[in-house]
Amino acid sequence: NRKRKYPMTKQFDVIIIGGGATGAGVARDCSLRGIRALLLERGDIATGATGRNHGLLHSGARYAVTDRESAEECIKENMILRRIASHCVEQTDGLFLSLPEDGLEFQAKFVEACRAAGIRADVIDPKEALRLEPSANPAMIGAVRVPDGAVDPFRLTAANVIDAKAHGAEVLTYHEVLDFLREQNRITGVKVLDRKTGQTAEYRAQVVVNAGGIWGHDIARKAGVTVNMLPAKGSLLI
């Protein structure tokens, strides 16, 4: 009900700013632990970077050779999502191909690095790779199958929000953080604008989480903190 009267202040354990994949996930995690959480989003859920991505659920294979730590983190989270949010994941798998000009020397190194990071990496015949993906380059001389997948970011974020609310979290969309509340050099809450009614309200918490994604530096600036971020756009050709 947008006509409700807001109290002057309302107390929570944690306030999360940003209703994308990260913010929704934090809200759910907190609520499952019995932490009273408030999620604030200036637009609608998943309208930022979360709603503008390729939806690839990385296995971590692409990082295995050069960044094992990231590869291990990817496969761990990959498996968690498949287990707890299978309705949001399409288990497509992924193919890493070797062309004649590449040779097969790197393939062995790649497979070894994947397996060392805990990532399934199956060397398959090029004919099998073409059966799995008919549009692949038929000139390939090698192929490795890894557990990449596709994730629906809208469904996943919405599912996290729904579950967070079911466990006691409060979620306010179209609520923009105007400023932070401070006491003795500590952030103690936020001042918020309801962008639909024009009303303002204050919410307090022991912890405030900045989950604003690429806009996080603007949020941090309101708290007097400089976070150096360089926004970058990319394109995908299919």
What are these regions (language model features)?
Residues K10-F12, T197-V207:
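Core beta-strand elements of the Rossmann-like FAD/NAD(P) dinucleotide-binding domain
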Residues D13-L38:
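N-terminal Rossmann-like FAD-binding beta1-loop-alpha1 element of flavoenzymes
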Residues I17, Y203-G213:
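Short hydrophobic core segments
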Residues S31-G51:
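Glycine-rich FAD pyrophosphate-binding loop
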Residues G55-E128, L132:
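Dinucleotide-binding Rossmann-like beta1-alpha1 core, especially the glycine-rich loop
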Residues L57, G224-I238:
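Central beta-strand plus flanking loop segment that forms part of the substrate or channel wall
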Residues L97-H167, L172-T173, D179-R186, K191, ...:
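Flavin (FAD/FMN) cofactor-binding and adjacent substrate-gating region
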Residues N210-G224:
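Flavin (primarily FAD) binding-site architecture
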